[in-house]
Amino acid sequence: MHDHAATTPGPIAAAERWIRNAFLEKLQSVKGTYLENQVDSTTPSLDFDFVQKFVPREGVRTSDPEAYVGCSLPCRPDMGGSCGCEYTKKCDCLEYAAVDEHRLQQQDPARYAKYIQERDSGDIIEYAGLPKRFPYSNPKKGPKVLQSFYREQRHPIYECNLNCTCGPGCKTRLVQKGRKVNLTIFKTANRGWGVYCNNDLVAGQFIDVYLGEVLTNDETTRREAKADADKGSYLYSLDKFIGDDGAPTADTCYVVDGQYIGNATRFINHSCEPNCRQYTVSENKYDTWVYNLAFFAYEDIPKETELTFDYMDKDEEEEEDVLRKRQLAALDPTNGDRRPCNCGASKCRGYLWGDDL
């Protein structure tokens, strides 16, 4: 790493080197994570601490992994084509996974008609015994990847857990095994700190999860009231299951705050045309309050290309629609205090946050 501190005056340079070394010492506890700054002599804040799992705060209740409900059938490699939990009708953990509607229609037209009626009417769906979409492909060469159906549709992804009889080799187990790629936190020219991967990534490849403090909604509101406008960049609501029976509401769901506690993904920048996406991944199908926020490559990403995702988590739009909204936003005098977006994408919305963008 080029040390710009060496070109600054003595006392300042010494202080900057001390801060740099202190941060690098923190990084030593994080496998496969590096720091690079070829822009200036700054270093990420020493107020930030790296962790390897969520840190629940007061008022947050989490499930005990020992109490997770596991699947009962063994995932046997000798079960024809290395099946097991891939035989999705029988895997209990995949009960609420996305239904494979095409297979269901072909295999059981009557049950398919009943399922469509339940789905379209909003009735409770009897998921047990229905064929499901398996989340991951397992190519002979290269890493496991998220199936294209899940990459595009954003359904929750379910994995087996420590109480399952299928064992650690089960093909549903990916995110829970942790990051397998090296990441570098680097200084960008105009957007603060960013992250790139030291390895080539293929579409659907798992990168890492987002970590931080898990807060109640009330505590989040209190912190936002005291913070500056950038606070929203680090807050992620666990609101995927709002509306489901027993799930939190918009006013009670927990929020992950990664500003001062987290991992390398905390430094990933926003883009209106991102190359990564964040997905819900759960090892406990009954827990709609706390689950993993997992980053996957949305497209093939060459090594040392900055990783980005959409902070607003919007679906892709046509470029002319984005341009029209951006022009209207630029003419709106109330947007003067809004944070501008510097992603540089052709579909850049111009500003971060806002339902009108």
Predicted regions and their residues:
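Accessory low-complexity/Zn-finger-associated flanking regions
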Residues: 1-192, 340, 345-357
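Short beta-strand element of the conserved SAM-dependent methyltransferase core
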Residues: 75, 195, 294-297
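Catalytic cores of histone-lysine modification enzymes
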Residues: 111-142, 146-147, 152-158, 162-163, ...
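C-terminal SET catalytic tail plus cysteine-rich post-SET Zn-binding segment of SAM-dependent SET-domain
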Residues: 1-28, 209-252, 261-264, 270-357
